[in-house]
């Protein structure tokens, strides 16, 4: 089983069309990885599906970096 960090990085790479090695924990989805607002919505939806969780809009707005996504998932695992 992959770690949460590995799974998040894989999803980010797939959703944003970047190489997995470019996805490091400090990267911002918008500033560093070229995401637009639609990309970030789709990214949150992919995270919800992968980790079987629901991310409220007010929380989704705070998930702007790879590390923030990892932290959110870790904090909300069943």
Swiss-Prot record:
Q: Residues where O-(pantetheine 4'-phosphoryl)serine occurs?
A: 37
Name of the protein in its database record: Acyl carrier protein
Q: Where, per UniProt, does this protein localize?
A: Cytoplasm
Q: Which family does it belong to?
A: Belongs to the acyl carrier protein (ACP) family.
Give the molecular function GO annotations.
Answer: acyl binding; acyl carrier activity
| Gene that this sequence comes from | acpP
Processing and modification events after translation: 4'-phosphopantetheine is transferred from CoA to a specific serine of apo-ACP by AcpS. This modification is essential for activity because fatty acids are bound in thioester linkage to the sulfhydryl of the prosthetic group.
* The protein's role, per its UniProt record: Carrier of the growing fatty acid chain in fatty acid biosynthesis.
């Amino acid at each position: 089983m992959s770690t949460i960090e590995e799974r998040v990085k894989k999803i980010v790479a797939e959703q944003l069309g970047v190489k997995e090695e470019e996805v490091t924990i400090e990267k911002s989805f918008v500033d560093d990885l070229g995401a637009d607002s639609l990309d970030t919505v789709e990214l949150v939806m992919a995270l919800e599906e992968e980790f079987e969780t629901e991310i409220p809009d007010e929380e989704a707005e705070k998930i702007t970096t790879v590390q923030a996504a990892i932290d959110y998932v870790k904090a909300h695992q069943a």
